[in-house]
Amino acid sequence: MGIEQRKKEWMESVDAERLWVPKEFGTEIDSSKKRKADMEQLPKLMQEPIITVGIMHAERIGFFFDSPFRCAEFPNITFDGEYEVFLSDDGRVSFFEQQFDSLHFTPIEEQDYTSEDGYFELEDVVIGINFHWERKENQRFKGGLTFMIEHGKVVAINEIPTEAYIFSVISSEMSATASLELLKAHAVISRSWLLKPIIHNEHNANAVLEHRTDDELIKWYERDSHELYNVCADDHCQRYQGITRARTENVRLAIEATRGLVLMSHGEICDARFSKSCGGVSEVFESCWADVHYPYLERVVDVKTPESVASAPDLTVEANAEAWI
């Protein structure tokens, strides 16, 4: 099958849809009647989901509030400044010499997720887990902060609106200085990947999948293997480093231009997984993940001209794969 035919089939299987009204929708429209008519063209409008993100695990977590926060467990106290939580001897969250199953902090003031003010900071967040560049750094976040216990450690969880999460992801995964069009594309892809299991109720706790033969066992851990939150903050899900790197006008413009937009296929949000490097040829979904075929996740040869596609070897042949590598 030629590249043009594959491109045609892919384009026919994928569409874009806006799930909620853009924040600035209609501000430039003079006629309220026209604004109402335009809004009626937006299908399946919904409230922007709040996303929960697992940031870090440790026996002790130090944190800092840049602005006043309230705590559900201490309703009469305003929290501002430096604090810390510990793993107690009985396996709970220790704070102010008391033990809790969970602690919930929320900002008192309304937050602008594109500004650098009104944040909370976590100490020694590990990034690049199990990569050669793994290291610790302090990171700043907007939204709410919850502490719970997971895997015998205290876990810090950030609660944040979807668009604020995407605002950080496209700066953390790529670079905030990338071109506007690249940032727009990344925003739509990341938003689609994030929302597919949430909106289509596909969450399945402890989702550890495997493929087994007589001499081989392959296991992979899906994003919905997380029980206490939607996604984690590292490369297992999508790299999310708060407002630490999200500081350019192009990032803000990319989010506003694509707000609520996702990729759709046959009435469902696309599983828009992405990678940083394909080695020259991408793989079909079912060869990497679950044994499911998605027509929009086909093998793609990364070449300069369509004519070069025919010269790409069949990498399912071991000898060809070794020579290609």
PLM regions and their residue ranges:
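Conserved, single-site charged/polar hotspot
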Residues: 2-325
